[in-house]
Amino acid sequence: MQRVESVAKRHLNPACRQLLAAWALLWLLLPGALAQSASDPIIQLSAAQPGSLPPAMAGQSVQAISIDVTRLRRLAAGDVLPVQLAGAGSELLTVQSLAAFINGGKALNARLRRGNDSYSLLLSFDLDTVYGHVIHGDEKLQIQATREGDYYHGWLFQPRGLALSNNAFSNDYLIPQPQRLQPPANTAPRLPLRLSPDAPLDPVGVAASTAGISSSNFRLSQTITPSPVVAGESFTAEVRLENTSSSAHQSLAVEFYFLLENTTLEQASPGCRAQLSLSLQEVLYCELGDFAPGETKVISYTVGTTSDSQPRVISTAIMGELRVDESVNVVEDVRLDSDGDGVSDFNEDLLGTDASDSGSVDTRASVIDVMAFYTPGAQASFPRGVETRINQLIGVANQIYADSGVAIKLRPVYYGMVDADPDADMDTLLDDLIYKGDSAFDDVDRLRDSYGGDLVMLFDSLPDNADRCGMAPVGGYQSNGYFGAETEKDFAYSYIAIDCPVDLVVAHELGHNMGLTHSHLEDGSGGTFNFATGHGVDSEFVTVMAYPGAFNTDTRLPVFSSPLLDCLGFSCGVAENRRDAADAVQTLNLVRHQIAAYAPSRVPELPDASVSAVSGNRVDARIGVAASTDGGLSYSNSIGPGQLVDLLADVEVDAAHVGRQGSVHVMVGIVDSGFLQLDAAGSLVEWDGTREGLIPATSVAVLRRQERLTVLSDFQLPDQIPEEFIGQQVAVYVAYQVAESGDVVYTQQPLLLNIVAGSD
């Protein structure tokens, strides 16, 4: 403190000196201010038994643990986190990142890599509870603890498996079906009207008849190629008609309803023509002639599409009482990349960048806003921390995205309880959530609009002897990554068991929402693309979307399928040109922008600040800095007496700098009165204004694409602020430095916080 005060005396007027001295005291209390001892673990095995029983999801290797509340909450990015999870020694993990949630919860990610040995730890915690996900080599553990005094006491355990019988797996996804349309009934004999006024009427002959035709004596199928079809292109249908009876049928005809709505007939087999039904509906009418017993005939037609044909063309074939519905999705090409910048033309149009200029590109992660509803059953499963448990499951999903190379960040924007039917099963609850079949969900649509929810999750307790942990519709099914149909958002819901022993359940169920199925072995095909599915190797492993039992393994790796990733020495996926292709990573990166655009963002992100590099080089980086007085629901530039203030910084590193050694810097001061800087110990020290004089606020480490810092947490100004402080402005700059080049990327303009007399 003496060093800070001496700096203030040399550079600032008396009023400013007093204010900065107060700020210096505050910085000393920030996370990371106290040095951590490697010999004194923050998380350690405990001989004392917690006051609670091991959780129901616990399986093997259940051990009591304790976690130091104060030291955990003071950790900052770059700090060393000592943990004792086995034996007598400690492992020294490095905190990679911290995050704050709008419900006040926090999350921490820490890692250790030592040769072939590695630890990964993800914690979500609030004042009362902490939940953890631990990976050590092939071992996966979970942490669940509640606060008792100065420590969280609880359990470290391997989760149990789901109840499975006879190797049968209950499917946990559904495929939304097009609405079944009903052709208008004909009330009079057909007149042979042609659509073209210049074409002659049908010649007088024997009228076609379909009397007595049904599924008992005829079989009809349509095979459409290509499927899906890109708007503006054509598709062809081959129609096979088989008389399965031992009787002959004379003068038959088939009609195709809805086919010619918003399409153009380009070609059809002889005997087929476009005409109007008596209800003045355009139909394709095909005379088939006579059918001998067992005879099969094949006809075809080709139609052209436009954007008006979207989202799908329906072809309903009717012969007497026989009806066969077929459809083809009409989509946009979401993969064409004209400028080769790695972002498709379709997605560049969504993002507002120039698809013909490789220098105009937005490679930031897609922020998908999620809403978390939970039932009383879920609350009962985690009575002291249901929302923190939700944060943990979301955090695990975000970590899986990052580790897989998927540029998605789930951001919870709403938590709330719904009084759903406690006796309803998961299929019924999901159905009620989607179609609002239970009054408990009457307000969901309004809340979704108010909070800008892209995806909606319902958390419930896991039923006894359950063999699945969730249920969700598959988005964009067989649409080659196009989610433009208005109904896609209407089905963007999921049911999730909050006490599922498999804590990657959110990643799995939302994977369905984003177009993924399980695997070719289980489902026979992919989801939105043929390669939009999970992957496994028999007796070795599966990725997030596949079921371990289908591949005779207990090893489920926390990554999405990709032929570019390594899984225990095997490829994590299969290239898309193979019939059994599996590349969920490519799928998610192609569709993420559409999912994030389901709803406009309502809960604010950190505001962007213009950035510059000391070198003068152009940089593709973003630094957001903001202060919040309401837990992150909004941001303010004014702080007053008694208000709790959080100061957050979100740094997106230039792609050219990712993977290099670097550090993050925070400079703070009174406008026109000089600057101090925050060091890695959380103390304020003098800054002479030079690049050489910068001191890191985080440990020098490999720069990641995104660095999120809680610069200030729950700071409260005094209820009485001296009059000379009112109207003063505190300026905050954030920067990162690349160690190799020494280049500094910084906010051009600071965040200015006005000290006001009263709260705004």
Segment roles from a protein language model:
Residues 288-311, 713-720:
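Low-complexity, intrinsically disordered segments enriched in Ser/Thr together with acidic residues
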Residues 333-363:
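Extracellular calcium-associated, cysteine-rich motifs in secreted modular proteins
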Residues 35-217:
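N-terminal prosegments of processed precursors
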Residues 237-239, 302-328, 726-736:
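Serine/threonine-enriched low-complexity regions used as flexible
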Residues 231-250, 643-655:
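Short beta-strand elements of extracellular/lumenal beta-sandwich folds
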Residues 200-219, 311-337:
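Extracellular/luminal low-complexity Ser/Thr/Pro-rich, glycosylation-prone repeat/linker regions
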Residues 250-285, 289-290, 673-695:
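A surface/secretory-pathway sequence property marking extracellular, secreted
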Residues 203, 208-211, 360-604:
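Extracellular (secreted or membrane-anchored) zinc-dependent metallopeptidases
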